[in-house]
């Protein structure tokens, strides 16, 4: 029994590393559903200053976006999305604030209710 416990304790660091590597490998092939989960569950404490996604309240996020001049986040501002993309915000033609996220070769728009991502061409 003691050997099994020691063996399992030995595997713990490798299992977290394996999960992290799997996430990195799956970035390009992640489905929209997975991206929603990544966005919602992102560890925003690791993000740099001016991170508007630290709050889980959609109203606070929308207010933060609205306070930025011209509806845009300053260049270099990082927004947590779990996939490591840089993000910024802008207002559409109807005056609604949306966040546009770039993931390497694809871009996605955060929906008005901040509940999901819509692929953009």
Residue spans for each PLM region:
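Mitochondrial intermembrane space
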Residues: 17-121
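N-terminal signal peptide c-region/cleavage motif recognized by signal peptidases
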Residues: 13-15
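Sec-dependent signal peptide recognition
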Residues: 2-8
């Amino acid at each position: 029994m003691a050997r099994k416990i020691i063996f399992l304790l030995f595997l713990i660091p490798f299992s977290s590393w394996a999960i992290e590597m799997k996430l990195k490998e799956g970035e390009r092939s992640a489905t929209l559903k997975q991206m929603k989960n990544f966005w919602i569950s992102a560890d925003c404490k690791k993000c740099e200053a001016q991170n508007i996604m630290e709050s889980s309240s959609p109203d606070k996020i929308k207010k933060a976006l609205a306070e930025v001049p011209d509806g845009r986040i300053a260049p270099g501002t990082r927004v947590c999305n779990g996939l490591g993309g840089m993000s910024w915000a802008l207002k559409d033609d109807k005056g609604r604030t949306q966040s546009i996220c770039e993931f390497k070769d694809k871009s996605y728009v955060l929906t008005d209710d901040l509940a999901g991502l819509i692929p953009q061409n």
